């Protein structure tokens, strides 16, 4: 007689987080995080391997990438990803037709691929189709598309390996947009280069630059973020500045007029963090509250509406927002307790909540596979359980994908089915123990505990 498994909707527990993700990065329609144990996780759009899991299958929940425990930082571009390990090595994967991975080819990669042999990489920024990085010696490097001079090497020639930009050894931070780059030196000066059609370089003109150009004379710039065609920055006194395109109010100055030089906005409280997406911006004030402004077509501002905002708008008065990441049309944020939140566009599962439903407000994303909220497909029958060799699945609905995950959240097996009726999965070679079977159907997802004997 068949042993049938009762299908349970696994509810979300707010007490299960402890410290989970400590670093986050959102790209075009994909997301990444590094956990406290140094593991790397990815989810969302994956058509060119930008998740790094060796497939081109989209994921709607965080999936561990490899088994390394020494990931240090990560940056996501439109369709490629960069990361640095604690040993100072540089890694890249995803789209590569313009050489933005930096491996000397123009071939896309579906798994993290080491770039060169240097062990002194310090920080990275993945732009739309190009990449920049700073080494521990303060040198600046860039590679990828260069049609607007966004690499800053004085040419408009694409590069498919990291190329040093100038000879300066005092670069502190760098940020890449669609086709422009902004950076800060250790002396607090601001620099920019690349496309300047909307004034996103901030030099008071709309003329593009093919090498780093100092912006103004201030020496107290502290944080920068290059959006698609606008820029935002903080000074060391906590003031917030913006410039460039303003069609959606992404500059936050109360207008929709482009500005080609840094312009201070909202001085009510010191700001401590800011980031920019395609046509919007996110920021955290010194009191830990979360704010946003700009384009809101998919709810990426997180205020519960689809209405664009041209001034900073309070999203959450909670006083423990710590890290933010703005992407093309979705947003990620971490609180100081390590809890992860996501909102905005979710067609490819880039929010990581196990669904493909857009979210208009910050939605908590559990890092524990034991507590993922799912839909229930009542037609599903899974047997036998416990299982020795083959798990059988019966469903009246179309089953797209099955995924088997261990108790640590690691993906063990992923299978594409694209059919209804009877399915089977052979797990004879699995070690004995508890696993979670995620079944993605046309009406939603189910996560089922299975015991391998």
Predicted regions: what they are:
Residues 1-4, 452-453:
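Positively charged n-region of N-terminal signal peptides that target proteins for export
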Residues 375-453:
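C-terminal outer-membrane/trafficking sorting elements
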Residues 30-33, 42, 80-83, 92, ...:
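Conserved core positions of repeat-based scaffolds
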Residues 36-39, 69-73, 86-89, 110-111, ...:
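Tandem repeat domain/solenoid detector
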Residues 17-47, 53-56, 62-63, 327, ...:
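An edge-strand/N-cap motif at the start of beta-rich repeat modules
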Residues 44-61, 94-111, 144-161, 194-211, ...:
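Short glycine/serine- and acidic-residue-enriched loop/turn motifs that recur at repeat junctions
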Residues 4-13:
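Sec-dependent N-terminal signal peptides
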Residues 359-371:
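A recurrent domain-boundary module in secreted/ectodomain proteins
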């Amino acid at each position: 007689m068949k042993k049938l498994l009762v299908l349970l909707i696994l509810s979300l527990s707010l007490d299960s987080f402890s410290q989970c993700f400590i670093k986050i990065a959102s790209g075009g329609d994909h997301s990444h995080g590094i956990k406290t144990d140094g593991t790397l996780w990815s989810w969302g759009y994956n058509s060119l391997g930008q998740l790094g899991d060796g497939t081109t299958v989209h994921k709607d929940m965080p999936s561990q990438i490899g088994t390394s425990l020494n990931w240090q930082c990560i940056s996501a571009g439109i369709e490629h990803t960069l990361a640095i390990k604690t040993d100072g090595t540089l890694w890249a994967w995803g789209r590569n037709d313009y050489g933005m991975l930096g491996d000397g080819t123009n071939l896309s990669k579906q798994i993290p691929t080491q770039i060169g042999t240097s062990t002194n990489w310090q920080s990275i920024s993945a732009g739309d189709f190009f990449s920049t990085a700073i080494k521990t010696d303060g040198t600046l490097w860039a590679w990828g598309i260069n049609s607007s001079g966004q690499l800053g090497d004085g040419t408009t020639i694409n590069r498919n390996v990291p190329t040093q930009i100038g000879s300066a050894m005092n670069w502190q931070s760098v940020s890449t947009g669609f086709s422009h780059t902004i950076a800060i030196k250790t002396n607090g000066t601001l620099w920019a280069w690349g496309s300047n059609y909307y004034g996103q370089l901030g030099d008071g003109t709309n003329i593009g630059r093919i090498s780093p150009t100092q912006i103004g004379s201030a020496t107290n710039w502290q944080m920068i973020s290059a959006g698609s065609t606008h820029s935002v920055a903080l000074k060391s006194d906590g003031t917030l500045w913006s410039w460039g395109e303003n069609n959606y109010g992404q500059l936050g100055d109360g207008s929709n007029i482009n500005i080609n030089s840094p312009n201070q906005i909202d001085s009510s409280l010191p700001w401590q963090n800011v980031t920019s997406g395609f046509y919007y911006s996110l920021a955290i004030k010194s009191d830990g509250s979360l704010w946003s402004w700009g384009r809101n077509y998919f709810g990426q501002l997180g205020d519960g509406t689809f209405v664009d905002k041209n001034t900073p708008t309070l999203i959450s008065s909670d006083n423990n927002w710590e890290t933010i990441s703005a992407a093309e049309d979705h947003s990620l944020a971490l609180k100081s307790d390590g809890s992860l939140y996501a909102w905005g566009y979710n067609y490819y599962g880039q929010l990581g909540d196990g669904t493909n439903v857009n979210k208009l407000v910050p939605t908590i994303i559990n890092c524990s596979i034991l507590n993922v909220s799912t839909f229930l497909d009542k037609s599903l029958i899974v047997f036998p359980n416990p299982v020795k060799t083959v798990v059988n699945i019966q469903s009246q609905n179309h089953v797209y994908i099955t995924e088997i995950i261990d108790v640590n959240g690691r993906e063990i097996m992923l299978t594409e089915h694209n059919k209804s009726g009877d399915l089977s999965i052979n797990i004879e070679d699995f070690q004995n123990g508890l696993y979670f079977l995620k079944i993605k159907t046309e009406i939603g997802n189910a996560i089922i505990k299975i015991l391998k004997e």
